[in-house]
């Protein structure tokens, strides 16, 4: 029997009015903020770099809609409306065709990108660095910035960002604290891309996920998606849920252990937009209903000393052959990676397993985003 809890028409946050105000305040920070996301700041580029980019900016600026033209930072997925995403995906399709040595492979020649990561990363950092390199740009990089940089000496994030931006034209930041990217963007003149801020947002992952859904099932309207695993700590599911509200008739299913259920702020966000969502404890029954199964790992690093809660959540929902048998032939399985044990490697060869194609799509979407942010 399926154990399912349907949302009520008037969702109430259990902690009362105070928490409601806090949640609404938090959600407001995820909406477009002209002071952070769209601005007219003058970038501090040398005149030589500006001259190098003049021709390229002239070539592409007329092609961007007003939304992408005004985009100065990429801090959360709520910045992107449907037309902006669709336009970005068209550019991503073009980026997938860029060949080494071609004219387009030199689009960002003379530009420098800094990747500043306070948390460990393989895919995201290398994806951004590969994206910049494939377009001819240069890279200055540091990983474990909190341990080996001036942050270890007590420097504030704001001071670090002001300094780093003076060395480059764009900064890609990953930080362990939710809201850190928005805080950094407020003091910067160079464009900032949020590569993940703790349990908060991961906007470029959301963009590549939406792009992958379009590629895999052929539509972005009228489909059902299940988010599975660590929904409390997974910034990818939060960002993707927000992004998908920009499309029509998308229905959400949340399948998670009790200790890592989807947080109330996202449920409220969906309710306020009239988006249907369901919580379920039955993965097989849910798999039979959906077009996209989005699995996530249980994030041990977010549990701290609560190892007993981690053990309760670990291994509860695993995608194996029985789950694949429940999926329709036209469905797909996605995962932001890395995985631990939540997807059986035996199903990797199934044509519906899209997670490695998903990772490759991230390269093209990030190439597109770098082009948009740097070539105005």
Q: What name fits each language-model region?
A:
Residues 63-126, 130:
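Positively charged, low-complexity intrinsically disordered leader regions
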Residues 102, 106-214, 341-343:
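Phosphate/diphosphate ligand-binding glycine-rich loop within oxidoreductases
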Residues 270-347, 352:
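Rossmann-like adenosine-cofactor binding region
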